Amino acid sequence: MIIFYRFCSPIKPVKYYHLDSINLYSWSRRIAEKYNISQLREKVMVIEGSHEITLTTEKSQFFSEWVFDSRPLDFNRFKNGKFNISQSFFGFKVKFLEKKINPDVYQMMDFRVSQSNATQFIYILPYSENSALVELTRFGRKLLTEKEAEIELDKYINEFFGSYEIMDREKGIIPMNSSNSNQNSPNKCVSIGTRAGNVKPST
């Protein structure tokens, strides 16, 4: 069930799934090890070519028939006036020490936080009666900083739930942009993920 501040709405038969990123990374590493896939952390400088792709990094050069590209978009290349903001978020995984919550209901948008010249809200994803992810999300040109989020989250949790313990933290940035993601890539260089415009419509 979803609650928009004070309005509750069931989402059955749809389910809300939460995937811990650490589990995803661990599974990916196991697959990479199984198939002898190497991981390199190098900045990509140039991708060029047609029949064979040449990928040049700051340290090396690689050749491949196909390249799959998930690098962040270069927003500086988009024209002025395009819809161009980011969804930045920061959250606490907390244990509530005073209040209990309904583990079957997640709170999707609570705007009872300062807006800071953007659009900001809290959402709460419960894990149990006394634990949840409490996250501050901002839509705007200026990215949410950890310090800003920590102050706002602490104020919010204390006001509505009382004392708490932080078990973990999470953060992220998702670009929200109306521009075409094609940035003159070679034919056999395939954009994937956010770069290909595949951010979920619900996001």
Regions found by a protein language model. Give the residues of each.
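A conserved beta-strand/loop capping segment in the N-terminal third of enzymes
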Residues: 1-42, 47-51
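Short amphipathic alpha-helical segments, especially helix-boundary/capping motifs
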Residues: 2-6, 127-131, 173-175, 189-193
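Short, histidine-centered active-site or binding-site loop motifs used for metal coordination
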Residues: 13, 136-140, 193-196
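Flexible, active-site-adjacent loop/turn segments at secondary-structure boundaries
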Residues: 15, 107, 172-174, 196-197
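An accessory alpha-helical subdomain
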Residues: 17, 169-170, 202
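Predominantly flavin-linked oxidoreductase catalytic cores and closely associated redox partners
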Residues: 31-167, 175-185
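Conserved mid-domain beta->alpha element of the FAD-binding
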Residues: 179-203
